[in-house]
Amino acid sequence: MIPKTLHIIWVGDDRKRPDNCIQTWVDHNPDWTVQLWGNDDLSAMGWYNARHIQAMGQRELNGVADLMRWEILYNEGGFVVDADSECVRGLDDWLLEHEAFACWENELDRPRLIAAGYVACEAGNPFIGQII
């Protein structure tokens, strides 16, 4: 079963962190644990892809968050959402009854593309392990 934990990652300039968006996840999901990952976690964690994270940090912070998300999901389980996304209603408990789930990107603009900003799994999920 997927744990009721929302993981939200923001690396870079904390003054630009979309706290208004993050708060929508907190407000609509009061019975979930919300874990905000940030700049301090880059050095505090023993990342498997630390070398890639460091190299990516020189070019694109979105890529750093992408690399972090897979390791967080694999190690902790839960649901990772993009920090700049808004939650408009609470998440349904039936989603948690599965080993993993993901959402499609915009089907009109990007058909059959899985949205990396909305992925969930149990800790140790082998598919997520293969991504890492």
Role assignments for model-derived ranges:
Residues 118-132:
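A structural motif
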